[in-house]
Amino acid sequence: MHHRIRRRPQEAPPRTRALAVRPARLTAAGATLLTLVVVLLLAWVAVAEAAVWVIPAASRAYPSTKAGARQTIDLDAAGNEYQGVQVCVRGGDRKVRLSWTTDSHPLIVDNAELSRVFYVKVTTPTTKLGSRPGWYPDPLVPRDFGATQSVPGSVNPGPTTPFYVLVHVPLGTVPGEYTATLRVENDVAGGGEVVDVPFKLRVWNFGWQQISTRSAFAMSQDNLKRSLPRNFNFAGQNKAEVLRNFYTMMKQHGISPTTVHYLPKVSDSSGATAEGDWANKVAPFLDETDGAVGVQDTQLPFLRWFPWSRSQRPSSSAILNYLTQMTREYKERGWHKKAYIYILDETTKRSEERQAERYARLAHKASARSGYRIKFLLTDDPRPRSLGGVKTANTFLYDDVDIWTLRYYYFFGRIPAVRERQRAGKEIWWYTYTNASVRKNPAFVIDKPHIDSRVWGWMMEKWDVDGILNWGFNRWGKPTTGDGWRDPYRNPLSLIKGNLRSNGCTSLVYPGYYPRYGLDRPTAAPVSSLRLEMLRDGLEEREYLRIAKTLPGGGTRATTALKKIITSVPKVRQANVFNFPTYTSSNATFDAARRSLAEFIEAQQPQ
């Protein structure tokens, strides 16, 4: 199949001759003629610069990006995998349309989504990154195939406008090659180019039920509520629908919210809960039955501010009573295997670690009454000996912590202790956020290449890390406090802490209700970002690595692929060191490593 470019005939601008008179003495007729010539020339230039081209999902097209040459789409995907690609158009103010031709395969047409890639304006670059102010592509605002759209429009710069085409391959799809044609009309009313882009999708003969990497992304219900119209009643069925769509979107991206946002009624004094009503409200999100969201990982509602406020000092018996009832409910509902307790954050002082010890032992005592051990997550690092300063030995926690969640920049100085804890059956997660080492570490900031989001899955497989925690997902509040309202479409600066400035590290999605961009449904799911799509791609690519390792010779194949991605590895030692691995900046290298794994896995499957 070859792409076809059709242009309506354009009338050439008329020739002009040099005028013998000086400009100051132009006649009215001459001035009119000159104006007409200029207008026609500008129109001709606009048409000449108009273009349609294709770039990979992980690339970035800026407002000033020049047209490329590629006009074909060639994707491949496993069962239950999502794959994206960007189609860019360039030109002045006009209407464009993307649609499927009638000969396109239903698998592609029925499972494809279209988004326009909008730009956000970074005015304060992320600290220590070395990036520049300017317009960055990020939010993926949903659009409909077949609908005409005005671009660039008054709310975003141009002349280049990217669109994001995302295809999902349902698990169980027959392997093979599927084709379609994506028709791009670059100026619907003005006679611009019409490009038929050949679209090829290869479906591999393997797949997965869900992403196996564990996760916890802090979703703010307060910020979500502030993003909705003032007259919207965020309660009852309205609230349930908003949360269902939000959590479903997260599930589709292979990640989980920390807490499901319904809390039980609790007696402050005794810790007794009002059972039943709360559990019935969260069941549609936590259950694995048909029609339920099936959130993969969940934080049991035992928080610094719930069921007791920070100023209260509940007795151990009250805490034990509450946790006994809650862990029993989780066991009876079948949620206990996905649940964890996470009540303290970054316990750097000995007194804080002793408090964690107390909470963990109460939680384990409570869950033991229901015949299991609920996992206790702590954002701390295991230390068999003192490392100086506040980093004293904490082996007294070894039997209490089930999920050690290490800050990424500490991890590479804790590997010996981490491996010892893994041999003892403990989970290891990474805790990521932006700091002064942002240039060296993977980060979710907007003004850094999307490789950073994609590499997480590969890095986690390389270092045998079970999960990832990020302390913000929709932090649409003030960058200093998180309170109030910040429009992330217009102000991407999501965090100010001391001298640190960060764009988007705690804001991976955008409000799904945003009439300015044509999003007028309050219950809609949040808007994804190029960064979040790349995170999912990396987590899906980790599934390739894990599947390959289960096959004869697959361990070697996985190791070879990882070496192409991770270009240097720091020395292993237990010390306060901050040496980090390096990784390729080439998306083509990622793509080649992924495809090599896919071809190996497919060849090993029974015919």
How would you name each of these model-derived features?
Residues 90, 136, 141, 148, ...:
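Aromatic-lined carbohydrate-binding surfaces of glycoside hydrolases
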Residues 78-80, 90-94, 103, 172, ...:
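Short solvent-exposed strand-capping/beta-turn motif centered on an Asx-Ser/Thr pair
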Residues 394-405, 409-437:
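Glycoside hydrolase catalytic-domain groove-lining segments
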Residues 423-454, 473-475:
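Active-site clefts of carbohydrate-active enzymes
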Residues 30-44, 49:
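Bacterial N-terminal signal peptides
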Residues 51-70, 92-165, 174:
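Surface-exposed binding patches on compact interaction domains or structured appendages
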Residues 69, 80-86, 161-162, 173-181:
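Short, solvent-exposed loop/turn segments enriched in Ser/Thr/Gly
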Residues 305-311, 319-356, 360-393, 481-607:
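Catalytic domains of carbohydrate-active enzymes that cleave complex glycans
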